């Protein structure tokens, strides 16, 4: 008898729901949401597209162009949320400040938010933004799972060494509440582990399939 993770089927059926410039425009605050965060060019959109087997999240050659909260429905009560990229976008400072205010408002107010997937480029982990997100997760008690993206850019050994180093730094600075893994969108590395995290947060049990 096979055991199938039901989150896989839901992710494959993911559809775009809406974009929100501010919290008031978000869907009703009920059900289950998992948010995807990351510094610009950390591979957030590519990871989302790989997890959903679709081109839902916009990828751009200009990092940081995700300016809105983008919601994707898995079913009637479960959603993935693509948060604005942080960093390199060539936009006026007031607009960046606008993004940050509404990002903070979203993270601080959504009762249905069950966890945050934080993307870090495995070659440049633990940026100031990453540490800020880790501080927020610790202070709020929000579960956080880190994808060390672009693992295909390093050798297997170098990737494992970076994973262990970042794990150690996080454990010392933020405790044991944060989980972490290697991930590569082009190589589809780490998909099963990421799906298990999503299933747990969205309260989907593994179900036997005949």
Curated annotation (Swiss-Prot):
Keyword Cell division: yes
Domain of life per record: Bacteria
TM region(s), chain numbering: none
InterPro entries, alphabetized: G_ENGB_dom, GTP-bd, GTP-bd_ribosome_bio_YsxC, P-loop_NTPase
Bridged cysteine pairs (disulfide): none
Signal peptide stretch: none
Ligand binding (Mg(2+)): 45, 66
A Gene Ontology term for the protein's cellular component: cytosol
Molecular function GO labels: GTP binding; metal ion binding
Residues at which GTP binds: 38-45, 64-68, 82-85, 149-152, 182-185
Positions of the EngB-type G domain: 30-204
GO biological process: division septum assembly
SUPFAM superfamilies, sorted: P-loop containing nucleoside triphosphate hydrolases
Cofactor: Mg(2+)
Keywords, ordered alphabetically: Cell cycle, Cell division, GTP-binding, Magnesium, Metal-binding, Nucleotide-binding, Septation
Function (record text): Necessary for normal cell division and for the maintenance of normal septation.
Family the UniProt entry places it in: Belongs to the TRAFAC class TrmE-Era-EngA-EngB-Septin-like GTPase superfamily. EngB GTPase family.
Identification of the protein by name: Probable GTP-binding protein EngB
Organism field: Pseudomonas putida (strain W619)
